[in-house]
Amino acid sequence: MFKKKKIYLCLLNQGEIRTDLAKVLNYIQQNDSYEIMVSYPASKPITNNRNMIVQKFLAIKDADYLMMIDSDIIPTPNILNLVDFNKDIITPLMLVQQKGTLIPLYLRRNADGIYDAGNYLEETGLQEVDATGTGCIVIKREVLEKVEHPFENVYDRDGIKKLGNDFNFCQKAKKLGFKVWVHLDYVADHISDCSLREMFLDKIKQYHNDKELHQIKQVLKEKGQLDTILEEVNKLKNKDANK
């Protein structure tokens, strides 16, 4: 008999849940392809909350995957499909905004040990990374059975945080041979002052429009037609300006 995968789904919150997230959660719970247990943990601080969640998950002996969703993240309604990729650690593409810059949590570590955003504008589908966020994450049971103290910040000798619990968790898991994945076709929204998902989609659209325009210019240039067309465009602009 086919055994459904059992998912312990935790919606981390501080006493309230957004309406749009509640709608997605309701849709998720109607998916009968999986056995789903839902919890709403609200302990503080966040590292304590996550580690308590892990212990409760491990106590459920037949649970296969832990999924955690933060209350400011709106995943896609089909987010449970990530379980079927059978990866150690997998997330949708998540985004943060720092000083007005949109940053994808799709990170690879360079030779200097610095995390850089991968080329998410060019790539699609399932991609292996060195680090991702924990705002919406699916973790296989074997990972949490082996990673000790999974969620903890790292501080320097002066007590200043130098590594967040999300990146630290990824580092610990990778040291034990587990792999971290991000699926770029699943884009979660991150609600702050605005929808970061909408900003991301606008950026993707602009990127591909610019790329297509560049390719057209290259073809025209190779055919010796670019200068003539640009000259005609400038004439039209000047004509409109003089009206």
Task: Place the predicted regions along the sequence by residue.
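Short, high-confidence coil segments that cap the C-terminus of an alpha-helix
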Residues: D62-A63, K87, F178
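A short acidic, amphipathic alpha-helical/loop segment
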Residues: V24, M52, N78-L82
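Anion (oxyanion) recognition and catalysis
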Residues: Q30-D32, V83, K174
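N-proximal low-complexity "stem/linker" segments adjacent to membrane-targeting elements
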Residues: M1-S43, N48
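Conserved catalytic core of nucleotide-sugar-dependent glycosyltransferases
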Residues: T76-V154
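Active-site nucleotide-sugar/metal-binding loop of Leloir-type enzymes
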Residues: N51-Y65
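Short beta-strand-to-loop acidic/aromatic patch adjacent to the donor-nucleotide binding site
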Residues: A63-I74
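C-terminal catalytic/acceptor-binding lobe
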Residues: K146-K243
